[in-house]
Amino acid sequence: NKILECLYKIYGDFDHLFMDEIQNIDEWFLFVNRLLRTGMHVLITGSNAKLLSGELATHLTGRHMKIELYPFSFKEYCEYLDKSTAHGTTKEKGLLRAVFDDYLHDGGFPELLNEKRKQTYINTLVDSVMKKDIEKRYKIKYKAAFENIANHLMNNAPSKINYSDLQTLFGLNSDHTAENYVSYVKNAYLICGLHKYSQKSKIRIRDEKAYTVDVALMNNREN
């Protein structure tokens, strides 16, 4: 109530409210639901897939719309840099390949495109996600093992995900813990899992591979 009072004092009347990473506040949904009942348009942003899927559906009354934003695709990368995607002539193909090489190295994080210290930016981003978004939220007990698993998956992408191997490699008590840690890294949008195409469900489940959500997480980090 005090926050709302201050907002009304500063901005006057308003009907849209943005909230970032509100899932870190206990029982945040009680406050949001109260705002929704007054007709307020509430926009919640966060970097955790669990919030965007399960928690919104569970805790918020009425309708809500989920929008997932990812780093730039190559087309968006070209549009942002005002680069032509034409590739009809030999010259156009050569120019486009040069831009594509840059994209494969630098990735599609918008903030990174104008950042000179790319490695520093990515290292800070990943460190913040692991320590603030994951370790704090999930109360990670074995922090060193978790960070080693996350870095291992990003540094070796694409690679098959084998929970028993991860358990042994990083000295965990069970492969279930390793599976949980991998799911946390996925939920934080550092990696995504891709299953092998097959008509047989056993093969699809068994042969999942880990990919970074953006190539910058492989190419612009201290390994």
Segments (PLM) and residue ranges:
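Short glycine-rich substrate-engagement loop in P-loop NTPases that contacts/grips substrate
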Residues: 1-16
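Hydrophobic helix-cap positions at the C-terminus of alpha-helices
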Residues: 7-10, 25, 35, 156, ...
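Conserved catalytic network of the ASCE P-loop NTPase/AAA+ motor domain
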Residues: 8-12, 34-41, 59-60
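Hydrophobic positions in the central parallel beta-sheet of the AAA+
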Residues: 17-20, 161
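Structural recognition of the conserved hydrophobic beta-strand(s) that form the central parallel beta-sheet
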Residues: 18, 41-47, 68
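Conserved ATPase-coupling elements of RecA-like P-loop NTPase cores
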Residues: 22-32, 54-55
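Interdomain motor-coupling "hinge/lid" segment immediately C-terminal to the ATP-binding subdomain
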Residues: 47-49, 54-160
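Accessory nucleic acid-recognition modules appended to NTPase machines
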Residues: 116-223
